UniProtKB/Swiss-Prot annotation:
Lineage: Bacteria, Thermotogati, Thermotogota, Thermotogae, Thermotogales
UniProt similarity note: Belongs to the ATPase B chain family.
Protein name in the entry: ATP synthase subunit b
CDD domains according to UniProt: ATP-synt_Fo_b (cd06503)
Compartment(s) of residence: Cell inner membrane
Record-level Gene Ontology MF annotations: proton-transporting ATP synthase activity, rotational mechanism; proton-transporting ATPase activity, rotational mechanism
A GO cellular-component term linked to this record: plasma membrane
Subunit structure: F-type ATPases have 2 components, F(1) - the catalytic core - and F(0) - the membrane proton channel. F(1) has five subunits: alpha(3), beta(3), gamma(1), delta(1), epsilon(1). F(0) has three main subunits: a(1), b(2) and c(10-14). The alpha and beta chains form an alternating ring which encloses part of the gamma chain. F(1) is attached to F(0) by a central stalk formed by the gamma and epsilon chains, while a peripheral stalk is formed by the delta and b chains.
PANTHER family in the record: ATP SYNTHASE SUBUNIT B, ATP SYNTHASE SUBUNIT B', CHLOROPLASTIC
Family annotation (InterPro entries): ATP_synth_B-like_membr_sf, ATP_synth_b/b'su_bac/chlpt, ATP_synth_F0_bsu_bac, ATP_synthase_B_chain
Keyword Transport set for record: yes
Stretches that traverse the bilayer: 10-29
Length: 161
């Protein structure tokens, strides 16, 4: 017997095997590989899309950080400006209050001076009147009319000086 003896059964089996391979390839393997290739392409597409989205997200994150820095700088600038304006307002109000206080003080001193002068005049006038009355009472009985008048005139002249 030969090792490679060919008989009809072997040929039919071999043909059946190749026919089965052809049918499997045509209906199963091709479809399977089409599905697998489509799935592979879809996965690769999703990976590329995810990578693109990640890059876009990183860019947006960088832009957001830049905007946040600009906003913080702007806010700091606004706060600094507001503090400076508030300080200026306070200083102006303080200066205005000091000027007003000085004005009131000068006015009060002037008023006190005027009142003092008025009181001095009034006191001098009353002193003169009282002196005349006292002199009249003292002299009532001791001097005659002419002497009284002369004495009163002398007192009034002294008082006016």
């Amino acid at each position: 017997m030969d090792m490679f003896e060919i008989n009809i059964t072997s040929v039919i089996q071999l043909m059946s095997f190749f026919l089965l391979l052809y049918i499997l390839k045509k209906f199963l393997y091709d479809k399977y590989f089409e599905v697998m290739d489509a799935r592979k392409e879809k996965i690769e597409g999703e990976i590329k899309k995810a990578e693109q989205l990640r890059k876009e997200a990183e860019e947006l994150k960088k832009e957001a950080k830049g905007e946040l820095i600009k906003i913080r700088e702007s806010a700091d600038s606004i706060i600094k400006k507001a503090k400076e304006e508030a300080e200026e307002i306070v200083n102006n109000a303080k200066k205005k209050a000091e000027a007003e206080a000085e004005k009131i003080l000068v006015s009060a001193k002037e008023e006190i001076k005027n009142e003092r002068e008025a009181m001095i005049k009034e006191v001098e006038q009353r002193v003169g009147e009282i002196a005349v009355v006292l002199a009249m009472k003292i002299l009532k009985g001791t001097l005659d009319e002419k002497a009284k008048r002369e004495y009163l005139m002398k007192i009034l002249k002294e008082h006016e000086k």
